[in-house]
From Swiss-Prot:
EC assignment: 3.5.4.16
Gene3D superfamilies from the UniProt entry: Urate Oxidase
Reaction equation(s) it catalyzes: GTP + H2O = 7,8-dihydroneopterin 3'-triphosphate + formate + H(+)
GN (gene name): folE2
NCBIfam families: PRK13674.1-1
Annotated source species: Pseudomonas fluorescens (strain SBW25)
Protein name (database record): GTP cyclohydrolase FolE2
UniProt-recorded Gene Ontology molecular function terms: GTP cyclohydrolase I activity
GO biological process: tetrahydrofolate biosynthetic process
Domain of life: Bacteria
Amino acid sequence: MNALTLPDIAAQASRQALPLDWVGMCGIALPILIDGQRLTATADAGVSLDDGAARGIHMSRLYLALEMLDQQPLTPALLRNVLQRFLDSHEGLSNNAYLRIHTDLLLKRPALVSPLAGWKRYPVSIEARLENQMFHVELKIDVTYSSTCPCSAALARQLIQQQFLDDFGDTSLRHEDVLTWLGSANGIVATPHSQRSSAQLLITLDGDQAGLPINDLIDNVEAALGTAVQTAVKRADEQAFALANGQNLMFCEDAARRLNLALKRSDAVKAFHLKVIHAESLHAHDAVAESRWTRNPA
């Protein structure tokens, strides 16, 4: 029996001679290495189809090139090598290559006061592009934090002042009386509203970076906000968290400005687009602020 040659339909000519911006695969499961952690990820891999006469690309070649990602720590240099392999395997067909990786980074976070600690999840996406031999790499990071409304805090303080006047008027008080009152239900007759909030960061990195500064960026963002959500806590930690919220009252505008200044201080950041979302507990809608910035060339 004669062996038949397997057909390669993708190598045939297209009936419509049209180039395509992006062709590839989405949702490819793979492991990656970031800062010593082996993480489960999904990848979207593709190339441009610039030869409009070609029927299609060779998706299996892109798939096989992704094997590089589970063998080495993820760095800008590795991402560029993968993209170059995409193009080398599609010589004459494609000029541009694209790779998006989605994962959840787990960081062990200590409690504010007690010796407890717990794991915290940070959704991260890494997008790399090689367009006309120009390399670009971007990070998308989501960071959750708590925000307490400054206006609501002022209104709550006023109600507490009024309750104090109602309870004591012009009565002469001892220190112990005031201390007892402050520790009673009347001493906190009103509380400001607060909510879990989210910072969504899109950061363009310097492609010459040796690594991906994901941990450093997260640490800087949480330090700038001062109210990162916690993991394992005791009562002392919860009290410290209440203090942190009271010392970091924030409208969404305040949070956006804090993050703007923090990200500008990182030499690894070439540009960013940040969005903060405060899921208002007072309202049925969200309060949102955005900020963009691009570093001027030296």
